[in-house]
């Protein structure tokens, strides 16, 4: 049985629920889901310029957990950009909390 997820602090939200290549209908695209905690980790580290340790404290997780979240998120973003897939932003799940609901 996997270990239960620690509640994560999610304070930012994406401007859109989906990013996809121009000129292709959504039904023709493979979709990749980006979880709320993955978006938040990318936002804090890559956009806000926080160190991983600082971002981990903000999200309420360990630095290693944040690094694992970032690795998954970056893989998904690069996969979508290089393969022409749609990147779908998921709403926050019950294991997250924050100031702004997704």
Swiss-Prot record:
Belongs to the UPF0251 family. This is UPF0251 protein ASA_1331. It comes from the Bacteria. Pfam families: DUF134. The lineage of its organism: Bacteria, Pseudomonadati, Pseudomonadota, Gammaproteobacteria, Aeromonadales. It comes from Aeromonas salmonicida (strain A449).
């Amino acid at each position: 049985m996997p270990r239960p997820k620690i509640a994560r602090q999610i304070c930012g939200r994406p401007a859109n629920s989906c990013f996809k290549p121009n000129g292709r209908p959504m039904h023709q695209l493979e979709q990749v889901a980006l979880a709320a905690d993955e978006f938040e980790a990318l936002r804090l580290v890559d956009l806000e310029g926080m160190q991983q340790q600082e971002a981990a404290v903000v999200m309420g997780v360990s630095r290693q957990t944040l690094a694992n979240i970032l690795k998954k998120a970056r893989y998904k973003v690069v996969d979508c950009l290089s393969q022409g897939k749609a990147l779908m932003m998921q709403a926050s799940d019950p294991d997250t909390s924050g100031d702004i609901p997704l």
